[in-house]
Amino acid sequence: MIETQYKNTHTFPSKMMHDTQLKTLRIGVLREPWAKLFGVYTQGFLKDSGIDSQIILYRDNQELANALLSAEINICPKGLKDLPTTLPEGMTIAALSARDDVRQCLVLPRFVAEKADLTTLKGLKIGVCNAVNQAQLSALYPEIKAEIHDLLPLEGIEAMRNGQFDGSIMTTVTTKVLAMREDEWFIRPFNAREFVPEAGQGVACLVAATDDLATRRLLKTVHNRDVAMVTNVERTLKKMFNDRDIAAHCERDKMGNYHFSAAAVVNGALRKVRLSRSTTIGLAESAKTALLKEN
């Protein structure tokens, strides 16, 4: 059994301006279990920054969008990796959290792992959420069957328990939020270079209405600019690929240099590139050129 864990691992800088009058933010989320869980998760990191909030539930995305644009709610929390690079008119990213663990994980139920060849994973059917993850996993483990699904995390858990899948690729953050126990689950994290994460992975973002200046001013004080610097590179490349079949991860080292890994499915084949530069200027463009270059 999974005991959901609400402890915050996404954090905003604790530098709230004491002379700023705080208000209670209204957080809008969908009624489905994973969205509600993420809403509570969001409340945790807002509280860490001195901001009180309340959750309001909605039936579907259209109702949620209408509530945001009509000022019924102030923010809608999303995982940055799940956010399209072009937002609907009237919406904007108001704040990004600090970056949590970006790694992808192979997750198997213990009853599967105990019988499997964990070196090759031969014969296992593993669920993945998109084509680039399918291609990356198949390159690492040629003897598996990687199958694309559209299940939410809690649905993916159930699919592994009932045998629909032998395992799944999940984000490390998801395994933390769901407090997945080692006695029930085998979890193998991948290095971000060998299995490139999705653009924005490990970052929570708060979407606000563009004209809600009060909320945007409040959240500006907790927005993580260092994270924005690297995720902007990732999302620029993602946009160049029309938000499809692309994974991207940018990090800055202690010397101030940027290291950018990307993977894409081009003409049905996996292509990967890693670049290092002293600046982010032109980094996404160079990665695109390298990924599309014919050998």
Model-derived features with residue positions:
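A conserved helix-loop-strand patch within extracytoplasmic ligand-binding domains
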Residues: 81, 87-143, 213
